[in-house]
C-alpha cells in the first residue's frame, strides 16, 4: 500500500475525489490540518459519493504530527516524495516502493518552504507540463501519480482481467 498525503487541502470536491480514488486503489489517505472545509461539508460528501466508508483516512494536526505519528524519520524520510513545480525529477522517474508517501500541497499555494527546504532534490518531484503552465488540479495530479506508482507495483491488489 502507498500513502497519499494532502497538506492543508482547501477545496472539498478535490478531497472528495481523492477519497474516492484511495477507496478504489487501496491507498491510505493522510490529511494534514488545518483543512479548508469542515468534515461534514456536503461538497466533500458529494464528490466522494459513498466511498468514505471504504477509504482508509487519517487526519494529523500538523506536518510535524504527521511525521511523528507515521514514523517518517531517518531512512523512512527518504520515501517521502513532495509533488511540486519546484521539483526536477518527473514523477515517472521515481522507483516507487510499497509504503511510500506522496505529498501534495494546498491548491492555491503548494507546499511551504519549511517542508520543501528540508527535502533532498531527488524527493521533490514534478508532473511534466508545458512550459507556460502553472499547475494542475489537485485531484487530477494525485490521480496521475497514483496510477504511475500503482502501475510500477503491478497494480497490487487490483482485479485485472486477462
Curated annotation (Swiss-Prot):
E.C. numbers: 2.1.1.207
Subcellular location: Cytoplasm
TM helices/strands, residue ranges: none
Residues that, per the record, bind S-adenosyl-L-methionine: 83, 105, 127, 135
CDD domains in UniProt: SpoU-like_TrmL
GO CC terms, sorted: cytoplasm
InterPro entries: Alpha/beta_knot_MTases, SpoU_MeTrfase, TrmL, tRNA_m1G_MTases_N
Protein's UniProt keywords contain Amino-acid biosynthesis: no
One Gene Ontology MF term: tRNA (5-carboxymethylaminomethyluridine(34)-2'-O)-methyltransferase activity
Key words of the record: Cytoplasm, Methyltransferase, S-adenosyl-L-methionine, Transferase, tRNA processing
GO biological processes: wobble position cytosine ribose methylation; wobble position uridine ribose methylation
Keyword Acetylation: no
Catalysed reactions, semicolon-separated: cytidine(34) in tRNA + S-adenosyl-L-methionine = 2'-O-methylcytidine(34) in tRNA + S-adenosyl-L-homocysteine + H(+); 5-carboxymethylaminomethyluridine(34) in tRNA(Leu) + S-adenosyl-L-methionine = 5-carboxymethylaminomethyl-2'-O-methyluridine(34) in tRNA(Leu) + S-adenosyl-L-homocysteine + H(+)
Function: Methylates the ribose at the nucleotide 34 wobble position in the two leucyl isoacceptors tRNA(Leu)(CmAA) and tRNA(Leu)(cmnm5UmAA). Catalyzes the methyl transfer from S-adenosyl-L-methionine to the 2'-OH of the wobble nucleotide.
NCBIfam families registered for this protein in UniProt: PRK10358.1 (NF007683), tRNA_yibK_trmL (TIGR00185)
Subunit structure: Homodimer.
Family named by the database record: Belongs to the class IV-like SAM-binding methyltransferase superfamily. RNA methyltransferase TrmH family. TrmL subfamily.
Name of the protein in its database record: tRNA (cytidine(34)-2'-O)-methyltransferase
Organism in which the protein naturally occurs: Photorhabdus asymbiotica subsp. asymbiotica (strain ATCC 43949 / 3105-77)
Biological classification of the source: Bacteria, Pseudomonadati, Pseudomonadota, Gammaproteobacteria, Enterobacterales
